[in-house]
Structure formats: structure tokens, C-alpha cells
Curated annotation (Swiss-Prot):
Keyword Cell cycle assigned: yes
UniProt-listed InterPro entries: ZapC (IPR009809), ZapC_C (IPR048372), ZapC_N (IPR048373)
Pfam families: ZapC_C, ZapC_N
Keywords attached to this entry: Cell cycle, Cell division, Cytoplasm, Septation
Function: Contributes to the efficiency of the cell division process by stabilizing the polymeric form of the cell division protein FtsZ. Acts by promoting interactions between FtsZ protofilaments and suppressing the GTPase activity of FtsZ.
Quaternary structure and interacting proteins, as annotated: Interacts directly with FtsZ.
Name of the protein in its database record: Cell division protein ZapC
Gene Ontology biological-process annotations: division septum assembly; FtsZ-dependent cytokinesis
Gene Ontology, cellular component aspect: cytoplasm
UniProt family annotation: Belongs to the ZapC family.
């Protein structure tokens, strides 16, 4: 079941838990996976889920439509993506973990899905804030292993140089050449 936004949804920063929450109803809250160190605002606030938030929510849902997620997984990724767009402070690219594929012509589009390749694995990300040189992304794979000790799990937010983004349709062909 896909959750539909309504006028009662509210973003809340809980200072006690140091967590951003989406209050969906009196008895249901969604805890955003963005770590406090990546949030632009870390003091108590409450803000309604806006029309822009709803628009992003439905756009991201549509962009993930072809992927084999359960409805709860899809909603979780999308809510984390909307929260990241709205509340994440500017991040520094950590592109050194990723292989340079340089297969992108032009700027990526909002909601477009790409594959990324590291020394250890590959995974998929969705663009949540495109840029001309680097873009803010959310991990949609279960995890992406960056090095022997560090990995990004699903719904983690990262900034990547666009030269590291492998168009999703070309990923199979590219990855088969690597094997």
C-alpha cells in the first residue's frame, strides 16, 4: 500500500532523539534515515508537508516504478529522498570511492536512476538534486560497499561527481565488460 500525503503530515525535529521525523498521524511516525550530522537544522521545529514535498514524493514514486521494490520499501526510499532534498546541508562529494565512467552527456535529471561502481561492488542511486558537475543522490540498492570498512545502506544520501554516474540502461553492458 502506497501512503498518500495529506494535510496532517508534519516534519518534526526531535531534539531528544536527534532525529528528523515525519509525523503521519497521531499514532504513526516515520523516522528519516538522514544522520543528524547531514541535517542543516538541528533544533526543534515543526513544518507541514508542503505541496512541493507532495510533488517531489509523487515524482520520485513514479521514477522508481519500474524497480522491484515492495510498496513499503518504495515509500521509505521516497520519504527519505524528500527529506534529504529539503533538510540536508550541502555535502562534499566523496567520489574517490567510485570509478570514473564518464558516460553522461549533459546534466542528470531529477529522479533519474544511475548505477555506480566501486572497487568492491556496484549499486544504484537516484538523483534527488541534479547539478552541472555533481549531484545529490540517494542509494536505492540494499547497500554499496565503498571500501573494506565503509558502506552506504539503502536510503543513504551522497554527493557524486557526474562523471561517476553510469546510465542505468548502459550498466549491464558496462559491468559485463568488467567481468
Amino acid at each position: 500500500m502506497i501512503l498518500l500525503p495529506d494535510e496532517n503530515w508534519r516534519w518534526v525535529f526531535d531534539e531528544q532523539r536527534q532525529s528528523l521525523l515525519l509525523d503521519l498521524s497521531d499514532d504513526m511516525q516515520f523516522v528519516v534515515s538522514v544522520p543528524p550530522k547531514q541535517l542543516a537544522q538541528k533544533q526543534a521545529f515543526t513544518e507541514h508537508f508542503s505541496l512541493d514535498d507532495s510533488s517531489l514524493y509523487f515524482h520520485f514514486l513514479e521514477c522508481l516504478g519500474e524497480f522491484p521494490f515492495t510498496d513499503p520499501e518504495r515509500v521509505q526510499i521516497v520519504l527519505n529522498a524528500v527529506a534529504a532534498v529539503k533538510y540536508t546541508r550541502p555535502l562534499v562529494s566523496q567520489s574517490w570511492y567510485y570509478r570514473d565512467v564518464d558516460m553522461l552527456s549533459g546534466e542528470p535529471e531529477l529522479g533519474e536512476v544511475f548505477s555506480v561502481v566501486t572497487e568492491f561492488t556496484y549499486g544504484d542511486v537516484m538523483i534527488i538534486s541534479p547539478g552541472s558537475n555533481a549531484s545529490l543522490c540517494i542509494v536505492i540498492s540494499q547497500a554499496i560497499q565503498l571500501d573494506a570498512d565503509k558502506s552506504l545502506r539503502q536510503s543513504s544520501v551522497c554527493k557524486l561527481m557526474n562523471s561517476k554516474l553510469l546510465p542505468y540502461q548502459a550498466a549491464t553492458q558496462y559491468l559485463s565488460k568488467m567481468a
